Amino acid sequence: MANFFYSRITNRSYSTKNLLNIEDKGRLKDELEKTRQTNICEICLHPRGHRASVCRQILMGFAYTSKTVLEGLLSTMPHDDAPLGKIFVTDLPPYDEQVPQVLLMQAAALVTSYEYSFEDLAYFLVLPLQMALMQKSPSLGKDFPVISGYSITKDSVHSPVAFGRNLMPRGVSCEFPQIDVLYDYRGFLEGGAFSEGVTSFPKETKKPKVAVIGAGISGLVSATLLLRNGIDDVTIFEAKNVVGGRAHTHFFKGEPSVCAELGAMRFPRSQACLFYLLEYLGINAMTKFPNPGTVDTGLYYRGRSYNWKAHSLPPAIFNRVHKGWRTFLHAGFVDGVAAFASPFTLTECLRLRNYEFASSLWQKWLDAFSSETFSSGIERIFRGAHPPGGEKWTRDVDMELFKELGVGSGGFGPVFGCGFIEILRLIVNGYEDNVMLLLDGIEEIPRRLSQQKVGSYSIRDRIIHKEVKEIIRTESGISLAIGEGMHATFDRVIVTSGFTNIQLRHLLTNDDSFFSYDVNQAIENSHMTGSSKLFVLTQNKFWKAEELPSCILTTGVAKAVYCLDYEPDKPSGKGLVLLSYTWEDDSHKLLTFDKGERFQILKRDLAKSYPRFADLLEPADGDYDNNIIQHDWILDPYAGGAFKLNRRCEDVYSKRLFFQPLRLNGEPDGRVCLAGCSCSFSGGWVEGAIQTACNAAMATIRDAGGLISGDNPLTNEFVNYHY
């Protein structure tokens, strides 16, 4: 591609350097330096076409843009009809290894008020610029570059001296470590810990007898790790007659291919440990979960229904809220002169494994927003002096609209009282994007885990279906009261029970003999969220035939409705409607109604917004007993709630619980380790269950005298965040 341009100052023509084929940062830097030395003084143009009076006021600027805009500019410049799309001009070079592309993206969004994607900044042109025209983006902190720039206009288009590809670092992995943990647990599992083992015991060391309480995913992963890594005597206690815990899948009678996820339901692709387990166990049947906006969605607000077509902008009434939230995701938040990293920036730092940047940016959010509820944090950001999107939200309308629209998976109104950081954490960790539905059901994971054979026995053979009552320290070890006057003694115990059981049945927080005061406080005061679901197996997938929305968000009783297709290759097959998925107060008000009454209440409520949908909604074969299923997690005697959700100022509880087995905070060796998603930074998500299982199993082996080879959670230097 040859491009020749004419300089009005030097009265000479010159060609631009085509650097598109250069993919080595060092070589690109050398070529651009040669270009600067050769051309910068000869072709410098003031934006109005005047000769620059002082050459040292001119710098070599980089105009970042998309491939389409680049090709258009090269084919028409320097003529006035040059096509201009989203172009961001800055002094930041395209070969800087220390600056991720995402920082350029956030700076561009802050300076120009546009929303940029990676594709929008994938190419560059080298332009002569006058320094006085540059505008600095707000600083993210002393450890981050101050990026100067401006948005190009018709009047300031200059003839480029070179063009090429943006080689700044960019993350590509869909899986990445969590922001609070910054450790590659998948790498640890993949490195042999979950298969052949990575530990050994000296000959003189007696291997411990270990009990695992709870046969949910965390308990079964803990047991697998113990057995694979040399602990031979492992017993699992499970109070229910099935395995899985909150990974609870209900299969309908006579329909083995359609299942209702009563517990964990959405599985973000960013969860590295979860998808390692799925691959390891050979579970690969999945489809996209029908989150709002990813499918045709119905919205019901103040007595009126609005239709939102898949992958398009939401209805006009939601414009200000949608634009503001999208801008926040990409541009972050500016509070005076301080800028806070956008969630997208933080996520990209995680993808790049740039833990130094990620931890510094996250700590800034923690310092400023840990004491905010989700509601007060949203008001501070969108009703303050510099709201993302440029328009302040109104309290009476926009805040209500945001409660219904939510942050990706639906309305968050019922949990507006939880901590702002807790919800921001979900977004940064990628839990609201690229969410999958497992067609075999999440319970397939614990089922296959329990079928594994290690040594002479399967893990299922090691499960005793009895409830553990009190856990007592004795001179000979840890005694478990398992009912009817029976006791069993173990050297070490891993507890994956819910907090209510740990406190009121196991009595582990009665004193400080097992855990420190701080850990006991975290167990007793962590907030467990109430949640209810009601599913209806339908005769057919009526919403498809009638072109009705596959997802409905309403301000009524139902709150969120999802139509699920477990047999996409079978158009005439049964359908499944999650008629109501509610949290907290919205869940609590339904508790006194049985499933028949509840179904009629929800159907009547839905008829206000989508009467045709309500008319067609009936259980298959008219079987109300078998084809309607509901579950209220706050009433589950062994769960005590659906998932942990931190309130303001309580993120430190997650820190205490997550690191309890590692004893990083001076914990006593009480011979009891905690595990489970509620002991993680991601309550209710499978990822946290697996991470804490790794911590507990490896700590149990270490404390019993085992030797662990290679990188592992016990030797990792975790970031000591201040919550």
From Swiss-Prot:
Disulfide cross-links: none
Cofactor note: Binds 1 FMN per subunit.
InterPro entries per UniProt: Amino_oxidase, FAD/NAD-bd_sf, Flavin_monoamine_oxidase, Glycosidase, Trp_2-mOase
Cofactor dependence: FMN
SUPFAM superfamilies: FAD-linked reductases, C-terminal domain, FAD/NAD(P)-binding domain
Presence of the UniProt keyword Aminoacyl-tRNA synthetase in the record: no
Keywords: Auxin biosynthesis, Crown gall tumor, Flavoprotein, FMN, Monooxygenase, Oxidoreductase, Plasmid
Binding site for FMN: S218, E238, R246, R266
Residues binding substrate, per UniProt: R266
Pfam families membership: Amino_oxidase, RolB_RolC
Protein name: Tryptophan 2-monooxygenase
Organism: Allorhizobium ampelinum (strain ATCC BAA-846 / DSM 112012 / S4) (Agrobacterium vitis (strain S4))
Lineage: Bacteria, Pseudomonadati, Pseudomonadota, Alphaproteobacteria, Hyphomicrobiales
